[in-house]
Amino acid sequence: MTIIAGNFKANLTRIQVATFAKELDSILTDMQTSSHLQVDIFPSHTALLTNNFKHFHIGAQNAYFAQNGGFTGEIGLSQLQEFNINRLIIGHSERRTLFGENQDFINKKFRFYAEAGFEIYYCIGEPLSMRQKGKNALKDFLGAQLDGIDITYPKLIIAYEPIWAIGTGESATLEQIESTHSMLATFTSAPLLYGGSVNPTNAREILCTPYVNGVLVGSASLNIQSFTDIIRASK
């Protein structure tokens, strides 16, 4: 199974996402994609659409670990269920750094949505300073981001996104990707995605790299042409 996912972050309006989704479903129909390809997109909360498309799934970028309640600025399971959404990103570095989500908080979110049967995209990644400390330090750092996470959960997808490569246009080298993914494969048998400045130019090489089961795409997923070019690179 190859997984191609697009994280829209705080981009695209509801109308833009609706247009994007309609075009994507049509293009995937024409491509006659196989059952070995999974395509997911993650719009912002105000742009969520009902998850009823033929060839791809809608997921959420974030949600609080509750059915509903007094959690200003958040959404809960009830809101996701209304859209028939059962996919969620957890642990993204921007949630960890910008919003102060620590490992205990992330663990609670993971357990809640695992119990709800969600497919979970669990993100891990290191700052450049940590990578520069060497392989053992990197292994310890990434391993700590898996503390408390059930790595045997059958609907777990691990997305490795080196923080220094996110949104910078500077992807990790193929050697760095293979080395890190091979190390992560000693922790878990879950699918391993790479994220960090993935684009139509480098997607095929990344997808052909050993231990890489797919990609989590950021800015290159916002344009239907570039995103579908990345999907085509998986064939």
From Swiss-Prot:
Task: Say if the entry is tagged with keyword Cytoplasm.
Answer: yes
Q: Which InterPro entries match?
A: Aldolase_TIM, TIM_sf, TrioseP_Isoase_bac/euk, Triosephosphate_isomerase, Triosephosphate_isomerase_AS
The residues listed in the UniProt record as binding substrate, with positions renumbered to this chain, are 7-9, 167, 197
**Keywords, comma-separated and alphabetical:** Cytoplasm, Gluconeogenesis, Glycolysis, Isomerase
One CC-aspect GO term: cytosol
What Pfam families is this protein classified in?
Answer: TIM (PF00121)
| Catalytic residues (positions) | 92 (electrophile), 161 (proton acceptor)
Annotated pathway? Carbohydrate biosynthesis; gluconeogenesis; Carbohydrate degradation; glycolysis; D-glyceraldehyde 3-phosphate from glycerone phosphate: step 1/1
Q: What class of enzyme is it?
A: isomerase
Q: What is the annotated localization of this protein?
A: Cytoplasm
Q: Which PROSITE patterns match?
A: TIM_1, TIM_2
Primary localization: cytoplasm
Catalytic activity, per the record? D-glyceraldehyde 3-phosphate = dihydroxyacetone phosphate
Respond yes or no to whether keyword Isomerase is given for this record.
Answer: yes
Q: Which Gene3D superfamilies match?
A: Aldolase class I
So what EC number does this one have? 5.3.1.1
- Function (record text): Involved in the gluconeogenesis. Catalyzes stereospecifically the conversion of dihydroxyacetone phosphate (DHAP) to D-glyceraldehyde-3-phosphate (G3P).
- Which named protein is this? Triosephosphate isomerase
This protein's species is Helicobacter hepaticus (strain ATCC 51449 / 3B1)
